[in-house]
């Protein structure tokens, strides 16, 4: 049973686009569907981690808003961070699911028990994951992953 899901941000929780205003203010679009899925997953007693290569106050705000317990930003070696997190939580790799969309997620996705990529993920990533989702990044892909895991964990009644 999956107890922890690990999320990449750009290209998974968002569509991968970063918008800068003329004042240099960064913005990202997050899916409300993903957010509801994440908050419900947490309420069910499961855990969520974000491991992302960039640093962003917007991501910190979204993680706080959703109650995400583990946030790692500016990470170059996602595999190492996930391995350390799993050890600190006493989780085995088969108890972890993850979503990633590009080559910097490759090693992390090979570490987990259930791996996913959005429909618009990189072709190399599509070739190694367990499931290529029908939704694109930022457009409900994380929610689709959570729905899949809820069904596989036989937790649909709890999720509702």
Regions found by a protein language model. Give the residues of each.
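Mg2+-dependent phosphoryl-transfer enzymes with acidic/Ser/Thr/Gly-rich catalytic loops
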Residues: 27, 79-160
